[in-house]
């Protein structure tokens, strides 16, 4: 199939990378907001190795809490959906970005499987990866703007026993 696909998490990671390259303190919301006008593409040319790094993941989780950052990303995501249709993957895609979409799926996996997958992806410290995943989930559930939640309309799919291709 040749279906357009957008990984919204990579957008936050790419913006996080941009902030870090400009030596922006990601814990300072106003400083992060100043960089937003420079982020005009959904995916700048950044290697996946960099985007998938622990540092970028941690900082992306922090900046994704900021309302103006989310507003900008959601606007780009909705534009993508309107222009291209297709599959959009992300933590608040079915509850906030495209709540009216008729096809909603909620993929999840057991914690140890998520840690194992992440470990295989970045070859980092197992314990640190587990803590990072827990902290990110907590931040995403507790953020004020578009918190992570399960849409009762989505079809839940446990991906614990599935491989990446499946």
Per-region residue spans from a language model:
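A conserved segment at the C-terminal end of the G1
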Residues: 1-3
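Glycine/charge-rich, flexible interdomain linkers and switch-proximal surface loops
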Residues: 88-96, 146-154
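Short, flexible helix/strand-to-coil boundary loops that buttress conserved ligand/catalytic motifs
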Residues: 91, 118-119
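ATP-dependent small-molecule kinase phosphotransfer cores
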Residues: 11-86, 97, 112, 116, ...
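Glycine-rich phosphate-binding loops of nucleotide-dependent enzymes
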Residues: 66, 104-107, 111-115, 121-122, ...
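Phosphate-binding beta-loop-alpha motif at adenosine-nucleotide cofactor sites
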Residues: 102, 148-165
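Metal-dependent nucleotidyltransferase catalytic core
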Residues: 121, 125-129
